[in-house]
Amino acid sequence: MFDEKTYIEREGKLKDGYIRAAAMTPKIKVADCEYNIENIKSLMSEAHKKDTAIAVFPEMCITGYTCNDLFLHDRLLNAAIQGLVDIKKYSETTPGMISFVGLPYEMNGKLYNVVAGIMNGCILGMVPKMYLPNYGEFYERRQFTPGFNECVYVDVDGEEVPFGSELLFTFNNNRKVKIGVEICEDLWTPQPPSIKHAMNGATIIVNASASNETIGKDTYRKQLVSGQSARLVCGYVYSSAGGGESTQDIVFSAHNLICENGSTLAEAHKFADESVYADIDVERICSERRRMSTYAVDENSTYTEVQAQNFINKELELIRYFDKAPFVPSDKKERDSRCEEILNIQSYGLKKRLEHTNCKNAVIGISGGLDSTLALLVTVRAFDLCGFDRSGIHCITMPCFGTTDRTYNNAVKLTKQLGCSLREINIMNAVRQHFEDIGHDENNHNVTYENGQACLLYTSPSPRDC
C-alpha cells in the first residue's frame, strides 16, 4: 500500500519549477480491455521510471475508440470499469505520478465519453467530453451524451469520485501545478473548455484524444495545440490514438504533442505509436501570467479542485532543449525574415520621429562594431523612406587606444559605400588629458581606463557642427 509519509520524506522541491509530462499511446486491440490494460500499465511503469509526474493516455484507450455500437453493450462497459479499477490499484506502484486514461462510463442511463485521473491508488476525478462530433466521419452522438459542467459524485468500486467538466487536479506539494482536462473535439470548437480551465487557474491542460489523419490535418493539429498553449499561457499535453484502432472508416497516427506557451517541446513521429516526454516550466507560466495585466482569473468560479497527493518532485536532469541563440532562428529563410522585420520596426519608428520633428540630419558615432553598424543601417533606411538625402547622415569616427585598423577601416568603408558624410575626430589626446586630470595611469587597463574612453565617445558633435 502507498505510504505517503515515506514518499514525502524522500522527495525534494520542484527542481527549478519544472514538471515532467508524458503523452503516451499504448498498443491496443479494439474491445479487448484486458489486453489494453496490460499495455497501459506497462507504459505507466515506463513513465514512472523516467520520473514522470503527469502521464496522459488517449481517448477511450481502455476499450479502444472505434468500438462503435459495442459501446452500447453492458459487457464492454463493465469490462471498462473493471479495467479502470485495475489501473487504480496498479497506480500504487507508480507513486507520485498522475495518469489520465479514457473510457466509456454510464450514469443515469446515459453514456459518457470520459477521462479519469488516477494517482496513488485513487480515482481522483472523471471529466466528460463536452463536444461530441457528429459530422463527416464522426458520429459519437449515436452512442454518447455530451458532458456537463456541474460536479456530481459517482460510485466507482465503492469510492466516491467527482464527475464533471469543471474539475481541476491540484497537488499538496506545489499549488502552482493545476491540471484541467479536455477531450479531443473539445479543443477544435470555438470555445474549448480549456479556456475556462485556464481562467480558473489551470497551468497545464491535458487532452486525451483520438484524432484521425487526413491530408494536412497534422499541421493544423500542431498549430491548434501550440496556439492554445500560447493563448492560455499554459502547458498542453496532447495524447492521441494510434495504430491499434480499427481502420474501417479512419486511420490514427498517434500524433502526440507537448507544448508550452506557444513552443512545441516534444512531438511524436506519426504512425510510430511512440511516447514523448517533456519538462514543462510551470514557474515561467506563472510568471508570464503575473506579467500580463489582461490575464484575469474568474472571480465567480464554480470549479471543484480535486486535491491529489504529492507528485514526483525530484531534482531531475532536464530533458528539455535550450537554444543557445533563442532569438536567432536557425533556418536561413526564417532568419532573413526576422532580420528584415527588426530593420523595418526600427526604421519606421525613426522615420516617424524624423518627420514629426522636421529633422533632415542625424549624427551617429561609428566604431565599426555591431551596434553602430545596425544603427547606421536603420538610419539609412529611415532616410530612404522619408526621401531624404543620405548626406544628411553624419557619421563620426573617434579613434582612440582601443581602435584597431580592422574596425576603423570597416567604419570608413561602410560610411562611404552607403553615401553618408564622414568625419574623424581623434580623441586620444583628450582621453590622456582626462587621465591626467583624475590621476590615472593610462597603462592601467581597468574599468576607469574603459570608462574614460567611453565618456568621450558619447560626446558627439551636433548636426549644426557637421
What are these model-predicted stretches?
Residues M1-G365, L376-L377, R381-R390, L422:
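Enzyme catalytic cores with a strong preference for nitrogen-chemistry domains
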Residues F57-P58, M398, S462:
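Hydrophobic alpha-helix-in-membranes signature
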Residues S275-Y277, Q307-D323, F388-E450:
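A conserved beta-strand->alpha-helix junction
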Residues K360-S372, A430-V431:
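A glycine-rich phosphate-binding loop feature that marks nucleotide/adenosyl-phosphate handling sites
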Residues I366-T379, T407-N410, I438:
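Short glycine/threonine-rich loop-to-helix capping motif typified by GTGT followed
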Residues Y458, P463-C466:
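Single conserved hydrophobic/aromatic residue that forms the stacking wall/gate
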